[in-house]
C-alpha cells in the first residue's frame, strides 16, 4: 500500500485514517486535476510521471523531481523568449538571429568574429554569454561599384561616416574589410566621345570627379543633370556652311543654359 497525505486523500478517508489502511485511490489521484504529488507520493522514477512533464508555465510539480528528470519545458526554442529557462534547464547555445554570416562568398576575409555582446547586433533577444562567435557583417557595407570601375571605391573602417542608417556600427566592431559604396555623382558622368576615352577620369568620391575639359558643366535649371550643348550639336550643314573639316562659328547656335536639344542655329534656307 502506498503512503499518502491528507492533502491528496479524498473525502472517503476519515480523520482517523492510518497509512496502512488508506485507500490506494487517495494517494494516486489523476495528475491533471490533483494539486500535485507531494514528497510522500512522488514516484521513484520521475520520468514516468506525467506531473514531471509539465508545460512551460511555472508548475509546483517540478519541485522534487528536477534531479531525476528534465522537464520538456526546459527545451525552448533557440531565440524565442521562453518563460521556462529555470535552473533545471540545460544551457542551450542560443544563437542570435542578427549575428548570421552575411559575407559574400569571394570575400570571406571581410568577416570578423563577434562575441555576441548586446552592442554587437540590434534588436536581438538571445545575446547571452553562451553565444558562439559568428561573422557579423553590417548590411550597409557591401560593395556597389560597377564592374568596370572597381578602382573608384575607397576602403572604409566602418566608422559612422562610412554608411548611413546602419544598425551595426557599434563599438564592438574592429575595422573590417568593408568595401564602401562607389560614390559616383549623378551629374558627373563621362560625356567623352567614344574615340577619346582617355579624357575621362575615375571618380574617388570627391566633388571634382571629372576633369573640366572632359565633363561639361551641368545646367542650373536641368533636373536631369544633362550636360550643356555639346560641340557635337554644332556640326555644320553642308548646304550653307563651311566644309565639314572646319565650320563657321556663326553657323551654330551658342550654347544655351536652358536648351537641351542643342540644334544648329543655321538652316539651309538661312544661308
UniProtKB/Swiss-Prot annotation:
Repeat among the record's keywords?
yes
- Please give the tissue specificity annotation from the record for this chain: Restricted to a narrow region of the hair fiber cuticle, lying approximately 20 cell layers above the apex of the dermal papilla of the hair root; not detected in any other tissues.
Asked whether the UniProt record includes Repeat among its keywords, one would answer yes
Its GO CC terms?
Answer: cytosol; keratin filament
Give residue ranges of the sequence repeats.
26-30, 51-55, 73-77, 78-82, 88-92, 93-97, 98-102, 110-114, 120-124, 130-134, 135-139, 140-144, 152-156, 162-166, 177-181, 187-191, 199-203, 209-213, 214-218, 233-237, 240-244, 251-255
Q: Which UniProt keywords apply?
A: Keratin, Repeat
What Gene Ontology terms describe what this protein does at the molecular function level?
A: identical protein binding
What Pfam families does the record tag this protein with?
Answer: Keratin_B2_2
> Which residue ranges does the record annotate as region 22 X 5 AA repeats of C-C-X(3)?
26-255
Record's family?
Belongs to the KRTAP type 10 family.
How is the quaternary structure described? Answer: Interacts with hair keratins.
Function statement:
In the hair cortex, hair keratin intermediate filaments are embedded in an interfilamentous matrix, consisting of hair keratin-associated proteins (KRTAP), which are essential for the formation of a rigid and resistant hair shaft through their extensive disulfide bond cross-linking with abundant cysteine residues of hair keratins. The matrix proteins include the high-sulfur and high-glycine-tyrosine keratins.
Q: What is the protein name given in its UniProt record?
A: Keratin-associated protein 10-5
Report the source organism: Homo sapiens
Give the gene symbol.
KRTAP10-5
Amino acid at each position: 500500500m502506498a503512503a499518502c497525505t491528507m492533502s491528496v486523500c479524498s473525502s472517503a478517508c476519515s480523520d482517523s485514517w492510518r497509512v496502512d489502511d488508506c485507500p490506494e485511490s487517495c494517494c494516486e489521484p489523476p495528475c491533471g486535476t490533483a494539486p500535485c504529488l507531494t514528497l510522500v507520493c512522488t514516484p521513484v522514477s520521475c520520468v514516468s510521471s506525467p506531473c514531471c512533464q509539465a508545460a512551460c508555465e511555472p508548475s509546483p510539480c517540478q519541485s522534487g523531481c528536477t534531479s531525476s528528470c528534465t522537464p520538456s519545458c526546459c527545451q525552448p526554442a533557440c531565440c524565442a523568449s521562453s518563460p521556462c529557462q529555470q535552473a533545471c534547464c540545460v544551457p542551450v547555445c542560443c544563437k542570435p538571429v542578427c549575428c548570421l554570416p552575411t559575407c559574400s562568398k569571394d570575400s570571406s576575409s571581410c568577416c570578423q568574429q563577434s562575441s555576441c555582446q548586446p552592442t554587437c547586433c540590434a534588436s536581438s533577444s538571445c545575446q547571452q554569454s553562451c553565444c558562439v562567435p559568428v561573422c557579423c557583417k553590417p548590411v550597409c557595407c557591401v560593395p556597389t561599384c560597377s564592374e568596370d570601375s572597381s578602382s573608384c571605391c575607397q576602403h572604409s573602417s566602418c566608422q559612422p561616416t562610412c554608411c548611413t542608417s546602419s544598425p551595426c556600427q557599434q563599438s564592438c566592431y574592429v575595422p573590417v574589410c568593408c568595401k564602401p559604396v562607389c560614390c559616383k555623382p549623378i551629374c558627373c558622368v563621362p560625356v567623352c566621345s567614344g574615340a577619346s576615352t582617355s579624357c575621362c577620369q575615375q571618380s574617388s568620391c570627391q566633388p571634382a570627379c571629372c576633369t573640366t575639359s572632359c565633363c561639361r558643366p551641368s545646367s542650373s535649371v536641368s533636373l536631369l543633370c544633362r550636360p550643356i550643348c555639346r560641340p557635337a550639336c554644332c556640326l555644320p550643314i553642308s548646304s550653307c556652311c563651311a566644309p565639314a573639316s572646319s565650320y563657321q562659328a556663326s553657323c551654330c547656335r551658342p550654347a544655351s543654359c536652358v536648351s537641351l536639344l542643342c540644334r544648329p542655329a543655321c538652316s539651309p534656307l538661312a544661308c
